[in-house]
Curated annotation (Swiss-Prot):
<feature type="binding site">
    <location>
        <begin position="153"/>
        <end position="155"/>
    </location>
    <ligand>
        <name>CTP</name>
    </ligand>
</feature>
<protein>
    <recommendedName>
        <fullName>CTP synthase</fullName>
        <ecNumber>6.3.4.2</ecNumber>
    </recommendedName>
</protein>
<comment type="similarity">
    <text>Belongs to the CTP synthase family.</text>
</comment>
<feature type="binding site">
    <location>
        <position position="229"/>
    </location>
    <ligand>
        <name>CTP</name>
    </ligand>
</feature>
<dbReference type="GO" id="GO:0019856">
    <property type="term" value="P:pyrimidine nucleobase biosynthetic process"/>
</dbReference>
<feature type="binding site">
    <location>
        <begin position="384"/>
        <end position="387"/>
    </location>
    <ligand>
        <name>L-glutamine</name>
    </ligand>
</feature>
<keyword id="KW-0460">Magnesium</keyword>
<dbReference type="GO" id="GO:0044210">
    <property type="term" value="P:'de novo' CTP biosynthetic process"/>
</dbReference>
<feature type="binding site">
    <location>
        <position position="146"/>
    </location>
    <ligand>
        <name>Mg(2+)</name>
    </ligand>
</feature>
<keyword id="KW-0665">Pyrimidine biosynthesis</keyword>
<feature type="binding site">
    <location>
        <position position="356"/>
    </location>
    <ligand>
        <name>L-glutamine</name>
    </ligand>
</feature>
<dbReference type="Pfam" id="PF06418">
    <property type="entry name" value="CTP_synth_N"/>
</dbReference>
<feature type="binding site">
    <location>
        <position position="229"/>
    </location>
    <ligand>
        <name>UTP</name>
    </ligand>
</feature>
<feature type="binding site">
    <location>
        <begin position="193"/>
        <end position="198"/>
    </location>
    <ligand>
        <name>UTP</name>
    </ligand>
</feature>
<dbReference type="GO" id="GO:0004359">
    <property type="term" value="F:glutaminase activity"/>
</dbReference>
<keyword id="KW-0067">ATP-binding</keyword>
<feature type="region of interest" description="Amidoligase domain">
    <location>
        <begin position="1"/>
        <end position="272"/>
    </location>
</feature>
Length: 560
C-alpha cells in the first residue's frame, strides 16, 4: 500500500445510522472531492451487505439504477456519484457485496483451501472483506469506503467487524470513522431530536467502533447546545460534529462540507497538512445552476417513475447538459405502465426513452416514440429506447406486420429486435445474472451522420448493458423507408446508433451515455439533445398535428 512520500494509504470509513438513504454515498463522494481539491489522490469503494452477488438482477424499484463501469461491472449507483464528483473511473473491484464474498468463500471451501478448518464468519468471511478493503490501492493517498446499510442491521455486522479489525491492525493514525445519522424534526414546534443519533453511536460503539466524526443530516444546523450534547454523549470532539444539511443541488455538498471544516478535521485527525482546496470548479457549477434562464420540459417515459433512484445517472446527465447550456430542465415523469395519453405529451418539448427490461410498459414507450417522431418532437432513445424506436418505425412507417422484439414475443412475424447471437439459449442452465454485454465498447459512426457531428469524431467509446440488439436482417428494409443506422460496433458489427435524418432531432443509441457525463464535462449527446430541444421549441418546428391514437404499438394490426 505504499504511495507518495513512502507513506501508506489512509482509510476513511463512512457508516450510517438511524435510517437508510441519508446520503452516505454523497458524503463519501464529497470527502473524495475535497481531498482531491487539496492535491491528494483518492479511491472510493462501496461495501454492500446484501446477499446478491451484484445488483445486476435486482429491481430498480428496490435498489435504484445499476451503474456500469468501464470494465463491465454492474455496481451500486453510488459509484456513479463517486465518478461524477471526482472524475476517477471506478471498476468492478470497487464494489463488493456479501453475496460475492460468500460466493468466493464457498468456492475456496470446495477447493479445499481451508485445509479442513471449520469455515466461519470470523475469521473467514471477515478476512475476505478485509482483503477487499486493502487490495489494489493504485497509489491512492486515501481510500474511502462506504459501508452500505444501517448500523444495527444483522447483515452489516461482518462488514463493521472487518473495518474494526482494519483500524486495529493499521492503528488510528491510518484510519478514521465518519458516521452519518439523522436528526429528525418532531412536532409542530419543529423540535430537533438528538436521541436517535446517540443511540446509533451507542450501537456502533458496542461493535467496537468509536466514530471520530459525526455528520448529522438535518434541514438546519443544530443550536450550539444540542451540538455540544451530541459531542458529550457520543464521545466526539465538538469540532467533529458537523451538519449534513439538506441542499437544493447535490453539487453544493463539497462546498458546504468544506465550510463546516469536514476535510480540515479529517486531515487534522491524520496529522497531515495540505494547501487549501481549490473549489473554483464547484463554484462555477453552482453559478451555472443558479443562472439558467431558459426552461424546457422533457418527458421521461419509464416504468419506475415512482422510484427516481432508478434513473439517477439519466437525470444528472440532463442537468449537466442543461447547466452548461443555460437551460433549466423540467422533467415530466410519465408512467409507461399506465395508458399513455396524448395529454401526457402535448405540452412537452422533448421525449427521452430510457433503458429497461421486460414487456411491462412497452406500449406506452412505443406510443411516445411514435408521437415524437410524427410531430417533430426531439427524441432520445437509450438502450431499449433505441430498440423500441426501430420497432415503432417498422410498425408505422415500414408497415411490417407484427413487428416486435423476441424479448416480448418469441413468435412475432417480424422480429426487429433479437437476442445477441452469442447469448442465444442453448442446452444447459441459462443464467440471468452477469450474462449481458457489459462495459466499455468501441463504436464507429458514419462520417456524414448527425451523431458523428455531435461527438466530433467517427470513433467513440461508450458503456453498454444489454442482452438484445437490432436484427441485422431488417437493416436494409428499414433504411429503404428512411431510418438511418449510423453507428456500428467495432468488434461485432452490431447496429448501435439509429437516427431519422428527416426529423429535427431523433436519435437512438444502444449504449448508455449517461454513465460518462459529469457536472464538469457534460456528455455531448445530452448537450446536443437539450440544446436542440430549446432551439426547436423557440423556432416552433413542432407541429403536433398527428394524434397519439394514430400510432400503432406492438400487437396492433397494421393498416395499409
Amino acid at each position: 500500500m505504499s504511495i507518495r512520500d513512502g507513506c501508506s494509504a489512509r482509510f476513511i470509513f463512512v457508516t450510517g445510522g438511524v435510517v437508510s438513504s441519508l446520503g452516505k454515498g454523497l458524503a463519501a463522494a464529497s470527502i473524495g472531492a475535497l481531498l482531491q481539491a487539496r492535491g491528494f489522490r483518492v479511491r472510493l469503494r462501496k461495501l454492500d451487505p446484501y446477499l446478491n452477488v451484484d445488483p445486476g438482477t435486482m429491481s430498480p424499484a428496490q435498489h435504484g439504477e445499476v451503474f456500469v463501469t468501464d470494465d463491465g461491472g454492474e455496481t451500486d449507483l453510488d459509484l456513479g456519484n463517486y465518478e461524477r464528483f471526482t472524475g476517477v473511473n471506478t471498476t468492478k473491484e470497487d464494489n463488493i457485496t456479501a453475496g460475492r464474498i460468500y460466493q468466493q468463500l464457498l468456492a475456496k471451501e470446495r477447493r479445499g483451501d481451508y485445509l479442513g478448518h471449520t469455515v466461519q464468519v470470523i475469521p473467514h468471511v471477515t478476512d475476505l472483506i478485509i482483503s477487499f478493503i486493502l487490495s489494489n490501492d493504485d497509489g491512492a493517498d486515501f481510500i474511502i469506503c462506504e459501508i452500505g446499510g444501517t448500523v444495527g442491521d444483522i447483515e452489516s455486522q461482518p462488514f463493521l467487524e472487518s473495518i474494526r479489525q482494519v483500524s486495529y491492525r493499521l492503528s488510528k493514525n491510518f484510519t478514521i470513522f465518519v458516521h452519518l445519522t439523522l436528526v429528525p424534526c418532531v412536532g409542530s414546534a419543529g423540535e430537533l431530536k438528538t436521541k436517535p443519533t446517540q443511540h446509533s453511536v451507542k450501537e456502533l460503539s458496542s461493535l467496537g467502533i468509536q466514530p471520530d466524526i459525526i455528520l448529522y443530516r438535518s434541514a438546519e444546523p443544530l443550536p450550539q447546545y444540542q451540538s455540544a450534547k451530541i459531542a458529550n454523549f457520543c464521545n466526539v470532539s465538538a469540532d467533529n460534529v458537523i451538519p449534513a444539511l439538506d441542499v437544493e443541488s447535490m453539487y453544493k455538498l463539497p462546498v458546504m462540507y468544506h465550510a463546516h471544516k469536514l476535510d480540515t478535521q479529517i486531515l487534522s485527525h491524520f496529522g497531515m497538512g495540505a494547501p487549501e482546496p481549490d473549489l473554483t470548479k464547484w463554484a462555477n457549477v453552482l453559478t451555472m445552476v443558479n443562472n439558467a434562464r431558459n426552461v424546457v420540459t422533457i418527458a421521461i417515459i419509464g416504468k419506475y417513475t415512482k422510484f427516481l433512484d432508478a434513473y439517477t445517472s439519466l437525470t444528472e446527465a440532463l442537468d449537466h447538459a442543461g447547466m452548461h447550456s443555460g437551460i433549466k430542465i423540467q422533467v415530466k415523469w410519465v408512467d409507461s405502465r399506465l395508458p399513455v395519453r396524448e395529454s401526457d405529451l402535448h405540452d412537452v418539448d422533448g421525449v427521452l426513452i430510457p433503458g429497461g427490461f421486460g414487456d411491462d410498459g412497452v406500449d406506452g414507450k412505443v406510443l411516445a416514440i411514435g408521437y415524437a417522431r410524427a410531430n417533430g418532437i426531439p427524441m432520445l432513445g437509450i438502450c431499449m429506447g433505441m430498440q423500441l424506436a426501430a420497432i415503432e418505425f417498422a410498425l408505422n412507417v415500414a408497415k411490417l406486420e407484427d413487428a416486435n422484439s423476441t424479448e416480448f414475443n418469441q413468435a412475432c412475424k417480424n422480429p426487429i429486435v433479437v437476442e445477441l447471437p452469442w447469448l442465444q439459449k442453448g442446452e444447459g442452465e441459462y443464467l440471468l445474472g452477469g450474462s449481458m454485454r457489459l462495459g466499455s465498447c468501441t463504436y464507429r459512426l458514419s462520417a456524414d451522420s448527425r451523431v458523428a457531428s455531435v461527438y466530433g469524431s467517427t470513433v467513440i467509446n461508450e458503456r453498454c448493458r444489454h442482452r438484445y440488439c437490432i436484427n441485422p436482417q431488417y437493416k436494409n428494409v428499414l433504411e429503404e423507408h428512411g431510418l438511418s443506422f449510423t453507428g456500428m460496433s467495432d468488434s461485432h458489427g452490431l447496429v448501435e446508433v439509429l437516427e431519422l435524418q428527416s426529423h429535427p432531432w431523433f436519435i437512438g443509441v444502444q449504449f448508455h451515455p449517461e454513465f460518462k457525463s459529469s457536472p464538469f464535462a457534460p456528455h455531448p449527446l445530452f448537450t446536443s439533445f437539450v440544446q436542440n430541444v430549446l432551439q426547436i421549441k423557440q423556432r416552433g418546428f413542432m407541429h403536433k398535428s398527428v394524434s397519439a391514437a394514430a400510432i400503432l404499438v406492438p400487437g396492433s394490426s397494421v393498416v395499409s
